[in-house]
């Protein structure tokens, strides 16, 4: 076999493993973005621990078939870039959605969220969710509210008894 075919097989395996290992994968059309904008997008994604790569559609299609992600091939037309995140489900959706709001040339096409092919609407809905840390802080404040109310009520009763005793 030629070395070109071997190289392509390695790339397909790489894409397949990233599709399977990532918690969140988003496909975007980057047509119309200039070099400075793409560089800025890559920087923002890197800061969020998201890998952003451009692959040939034919190789991506083969990887999608190997990863058994039916329905994703429909979105693999034109120039595409793929954002992979193995840590945070929300991070790539959030960064790409914010960037797409500022730069209309970036178009979110589809995504794979925890192994399930997702539409643009689902990706955008995911982007609107708070981060894991934000959700945890909300949960913590909800859990602390009854304790705080009990402490305030106890303090009020103590002050009331103090006034009656004085």
From Swiss-Prot:
Superkingdom classification of source: Bacteria
The keyword RNA-binding appears for this protein: yes
Gene3D superfamilies attached to this UniProt entry: 3.30.70.1730, 6.10.250.290
Coiled-coil ranges from the UniProt annotation: none
GO molecular function, one term: structural constituent of ribosome
GO cellular component, one term: large ribosomal subunit
InterPro entries named among the record's database cross-references: Ribosomal_uL10 (IPR001790), Ribosomal_uL10-like_sf (IPR043141), Ribosomal_uL10_bac (IPR022973), Ribosomal_uL10_bac_type (IPR047865), Ribosomal_uL10_CS_bac (IPR002363)
N-terminal signal peptide: none
HAMAP family: Ribosomal_uL10 (MF_00362)
Subunit structure: Part of the ribosomal stalk of the 50S ribosomal subunit. The N-terminus interacts with L11 and the large rRNA to form the base of the stalk. The C-terminus forms an elongated spine to which L12 dimers bind in a sequential fashion forming a multimeric L10(L12)X complex.
NCBIfam families with a match to the protein in the record: PRK00099.1-1 (NF000955)
Protein name: Large ribosomal subunit protein uL10
Gene for this chain: rplJ
